[in-house]
Amino acid sequence: MPDPARLADAAREGLAFVSAQPGVIEAEVFVADNRSLLTRLNYTSHIPCNGVEEPKSTETYGLGIQASFESSDGPLLGFGSEPSDLSPAGVARALDKARRGAVRDPEFRSLPRPGAARRVLVDYHDPALLAIDDAQLVECGWKVLQGGLNGFLTASRLGELAGSDEALRTLGLILGGDVTIVQESIAIASTAMPEPQTDVTTLIMSFVTGMVESRDAKGSGWSTGTRLADLTDEAGADAARRAVEAVGGERVPTGDYTVIFGRQPITDLMNNLVVPSCQAGSFYASSTPFLGKLGKRVASPRLSIYDEGAMPGLMGSKGITCEGLPTGRTNLIKDGVLVGTLASWYEAQRLLHDPGLKEKLGVDASEAAPALVARSGFRTGSGGRAFDTQPETSASNIVIAGSDPVSLDELIRSVRDGLYVGRIWYTYPINGLRAGDFTCTVVGDSFIIRDGRIVAPLKANTVRINDNITRVLEHVVGVTKDTKGTLVWAAEEVVYTPEIAVTGVHVDAIAGFMEALA
């Protein structure tokens, strides 16, 4: 189990050692102890399997030092780290690496400084997740897997396809995925904030894909939480149900459709397009489609997006950033208007002192300052808050809210004719992020809407969406009432989002040649 007091002592002693060395102007010592536990799900009805496999864990701990050094050319900035050694010898080696790698950075102003904001989230981790043992980890896997198996067994559609209970396994029923638990413990101390601060975080998540292989049908399910008690069999049950619903998928022609985006597609669009576009570094590099638009409308007036970094119970919440600054709420888009950015201390200071600030944000420094508060400096990597990297800008909990929300059934009725897109893959900007153009493939959990109701599943991997994210944001026509925490592959943030309807989404039919091969 992580020991925050030990980490705090290492940060305090490390800072004292570094500060006493010749040529050091200011320094920051970051200490981390991370554990990631995983159990893999692997059920195949037609191939012998274990159901739950590979319970395993990884652990990383160490310290990183960021320091500025005196030189005849001005301050030099360096970073060094040392794994698995929090002793004075480890501190000395990390400092030596920082000194030897130090370079002149004319845009560096200072290491983070405290402001008026104070920490609001403390003692929010789950002791049960910190103390979980191997048997409990395996039991978590079985809980999620059992939800999927029950979903398959109670699906009348599968009984009709198989003809008998004994023949069910010949349909090729598959459940794959994992349950992952992350335990994070950090301490940080710096010249500007010499008293060590600690933060302990726990989270648990599950991802499941269900398949009816003989019918080329698949579905997905997931869950997010911060406590062991949050884990249910929901992810497995959802994956099985959606796989069954996907049987008999149909194609649609190329065209512009009103699309209801499910939570996973919205999360993927946020992760790959909207969140990067709202980062201070993107404005500095003039690589955002929102360039020069702070205070201007960039989305439908019914849409608001913010990063909620300190809300209890949300999976991405932290007490402090990896720069030792308080987390909190950062409004990005409010009622369709761009009002803020995600920023680390370095990126905020760099942009505030940029001669081209007004061109890049659209306002002068006094108006820009409230939109450049450093609440998003995190050291993400290796399954936790990494000691061996410098802070970068990262969101925590992206929350999407819409005015006049309705039920999903009501939203489907209002669409009349269109598509429900429940899962996309390979989402990326084309022509550069600034252009806003993007493409993605619809890979499952999707349906055709006619006359205000769902009439058939959309066949997976038969359409691509090619559109522009600024156009999508501006053409939101409805949102649902319920939000759910959602993760996508390689994302650092969790997105809490409803389902969202957008008009005029361009869809291209693909892979038509596959029909001739069937």
Say what each PLM segment does.
Residues M1-R329, K334-V337, T497-A518:
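Active-site bordering "gate/hinge" segments
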